[in-house]
Amino acid sequence: MSDDVFTLGPAAFGSRLIMGTGGAPSLEVLERSLIASGTELTTVAMRRLDPTVQGSVLSVLERLSIRVLPNTAGCFTAGEAVLTARLAREALGTDWVKLEVVADERTLLPDPIELLDAAEVLVDDGFTVLPYTNDDPVLARKLEDVGCAAIMPLGSPIGSGLGIRNPHNFELIVERAGVPVILDAGAGTASDAAQAMELGCAAVMLASAVTRAQEPELMAGAMRHAVEGGRLAYRAGRIPRRHFAEASSPVAGRAVLDPERPAF
């Protein structure tokens, strides 16, 4: 869909699938999955990354010409997230950051107060901030108001595979947003990615759904097609939901029996 470019901050992408790298069984499987997904933007967790190591995730992304998106996974306070983002900028030479500030290790749900504080500091510091957030339309608006380049609500908890539990909130967020809305967590299979796009999301971000699948490369390809299909369906416009049937065939030309001349 070369006529449907995905614009995110100052950059444009042909693919609307953003991949994560966590949970891959090996670098070889990860590389094949990234190729199958067609992604052009992939996240890496700074706390698990050593840029000096040869044969790392970074070398795979460089070989595939995929843009690196560092994230602040594992941060519980705004201060930790800001420090991690600044270290990433120094180490990787990018001012893009996928901002994650979670409340606890059990749920990995975003801490809205710490998240908003960190977002405001990083935007003021010149970062292109992509925040992982709750599916809360009010918080989404506040994140956009402080200057975030996108809103990335979760469909369900990270790694849960439960899909989008509150599609109505996604519709509200999309309807009010002036920046791209990206599904950021919860996808378990291709239909979840397609649903996100049909709800109006500009892109889908996922990792576990691919890296922990029985066949990661196959699932990556499925996700690619699901995102593309869901986007086409959204652009095409679905038919209205109705309580009763509506015939698709015209009435004109229908055979009508003459009661005085039985057919048999």
Swiss-Prot record:
Pfam families in alphabetical order: ThiG
PANTHER family listed in its UniProt record: THIAZOLE SYNTHASE
Record's keyword terms, sorted: Cytoplasm, Schiff base, Thiamine biosynthesis, Transferase
GO molecular function: thiazole synthase activity
GO cellular component, one term: cytoplasm
Pathway where it operates: Cofactor biosynthesis; thiamine diphosphate biosynthesis
EC number: 2.8.1.10
Lineage per the UniProt record: Bacteria, Bacillati, Actinomycetota, Actinomycetes, Kitasatosporales
Record's subunit section: Homotetramer. Forms heterodimers with either ThiH or ThiS.
Root EC class: transferase
CDD domains listed in its UniProt record: ThiG
Family according to the record: Belongs to the ThiG family.
SUPFAM superfamilies (alphabetical): ThiG-like
Organism: Streptomyces griseus subsp. griseus (strain JCM 4626 / CBS 651.72 / NBRC 13350 / KCC S-0626 / ISP 5235)
InterPro entries documented for this protein: Aldolase_TIM, Thiazole_synthase_ThiG, ThiG
Primary localisation category: cytoplasm
Compartments in which it is found: Cytoplasm
Residues that bind 1-deoxy-D-xylulose 5-phosphate: G159, A185, G186, A207, S208
Catalysed reactions, semicolon-separated: [ThiS sulfur-carrier protein]-C-terminal-Gly-aminoethanethioate + 2-iminoacetate + 1-deoxy-D-xylulose 5-phosphate = [ThiS sulfur-carrier protein]-C-terminal Gly-Gly + 2-[(2R,5Z)-2-carboxy-4-methylthiazol-5(2H)-ylidene]ethyl phosphate + 2 H2O + H(+)
HAMAP family per UniProt: ThiG (MF_00443)
Role, per record: Catalyzes the rearrangement of 1-deoxy-D-xylulose 5-phosphate (DXP) to produce the thiazole phosphate moiety of thiamine. Sulfur is provided by the thiocarboxylate moiety of the carrier protein ThiS. In vitro, sulfur can be provided by H(2)S.
Active site: K98
Domain of life: Bacteria
GO biological process, one term: thiamine diphosphate biosynthetic process
The protein, known as: Thiazole synthase
